[in-house]
Amino acid sequence: MSTTTSYKVFSGTNSRYLAEKICNSLGCELGNMNITHFADGEFAVSFEESIRGSHVFLVQSTFPNSDNLMELLLMIDAAKRASAKSIIAVIPYFGWARQDRKDKPRVSIGAKLVADLLSVAGIDRLITMDLHADQIQGFFDIPVDHLYASTIFLPYVQAMNLKNLVIASPDVGGSKRASSYAKYLDCPLVLCNKTRERANVVATMQIIGDVEGKDVIIVDDMVDTAGTITKAADIMKEAGAASVRAIASHCVMSGPASERVEKSLLEEMLFTDSIPYNNACPKVKQLTVADMFAEAIRRVMNNQSISDQYLI
């Protein structure tokens, strides 16, 4: 890398697997830091090498629980107190992003709160991928580099060479994302219209469009309990689809998700490795985003544009 200022990459406990791959792509060593856990549940963070005057990249997805967010905040605080030149949070999966608006009375807006916490802690820039809502970028008063998993998904889909390809959105809210995929791949778009009984429980779903004899790929930003995406797959197969696959950026896969995917009529469930997945569901496959994040880090360090990486 041709830059006059040093940079260092560190990772919290949650994303070390991805940070190591990012460092391999960058040709650098993952920085050494220590996270000490205490009997009362608290933990402390310390850098085990000098970061004075360095650009510090901190890799940590804020999932599956709030400990990972707190760990990242402590990493940021420690870096600031250790005289880092700049602090860049690399958050492959930005948790709390579904709480992006006040959609009913007396509710919190978790995404805005997390943005404020990160900013107050001391980050100078955020690099993230496929936020649940694009407007979350506006919650920050610092630069946000928003990457898209479509950069790796679209070539994968093209290589499948499906002759009767149809792109589907599992709900109306994801129609913009699915429409971009359909336009790039030059194929039809199908929508699903769903109603919920309560959070994570889909009551009814209807297909808007023709899937008979088609190879359907459902596109979403994340899969949580997999209720929506597996119900959509089953309904599309019942409507005559030749095959149904799904791709989603973030492998949240909580609760009964793995069992639902395994029992569903999905042929394949494709994710990135923004979140580790250790359940041995044979239908689940992960593509790494390490090279994409490494390239973003290179370009940040060299003051180059990131947008020309995007396919859509």
Regions found by a protein language model. Name each.
Residues 1-312:
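PRPP-associated nucleotide enzymes
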